[in-house]
Amino acid sequence: MQSNGKRIAIVTGSALGLGYELARQLIAEGWFVAGVDFNAERQAELEGEFGAGSYKAFVGDVSDEAFVNASIAEIAGLGHVDLLINNAGQPSFKTPAAYEAADVDKCLKGLKGMILWSVATLRADGETDLKIANVMSTAATRGNANESVYCATKWGEKGYTQSLKAAYKGTSVKIVGVYPGGIDTAFYRDSHDYVSEEKQHTFMDPAQLAGVILFNLVNDANLTVSDILIERNYV
């Protein structure tokens, strides 16, 4: 695995949907992407699609500390990590009384993974010259019916993001909170008990969304867009 002098980005949840588009568009702009996902079959496909000089797949659970640390050690061997995009997460849409412990554990994997990948990358970079973008949801900005556990997780992610901003204010570590609304991916398409098919056309295209996010994240301007709130059009 070689980065060939390219800027290095880590994208968690890179196999499908928004994560895939973020990885694809970064690679198109000349980045080397370390993609993290539990979908081994899809990860193998992406290594073939992008090539070893642009993409390295790491297959595992983002909330597994041993996996995180081993992966970061390998990635750091290539050079300084410039960008970490914590994108991985899983949904759980149910009425409040229908939730079980397994649903809570599933949602919390995203929060735990965000923390572990941030900590490990910060350590590897010596807490310098790093941008961390935490992709959450508009569910981190309000409470939604039938999303109580999901919202609780996203609010936790927002709290972590805000705390990182406070800790690294005035340094070369930049923290960005990303809050997108509904995206037209399997994340919602597989949840038609909650999201009606009639509303699906109003959800955001992941390629367009990734372009908007990266336009704000990756540029040569002497500024940082600290929060990116992106709502879908409801028509």
PLM regions with names:
Residues A15-L16:
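Conserved glycine-rich cofactor-binding loop
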Residues E29-E45:
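Conserved glycine-rich Rossmann-like NAD(P)H-binding loop of the short-chain dehydrogenase/reductase
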Residues N69, Q90-D103, N146-V149, Y188:
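Conserved mid-core segment of classical short-chain dehydrogenase/reductases
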Residues A73, G77, A101, K109-D129, ...:
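Amphipathic alpha-helical dimer-interface segment in Rossmann-like NAD(P)H-dependent oxidoreductases
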Residues Q90, A97-L116, A133, E157:
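Catalytic Tyr-X3-Lys loop
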Residues S118, T153-K154:
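Active-site helix of classical SDR
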Residues S137:
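Residue(s) in the substrate-gating loop at a strand-loop-helix junction
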Residues G177, E197-V235:
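C-terminal helical subdomain
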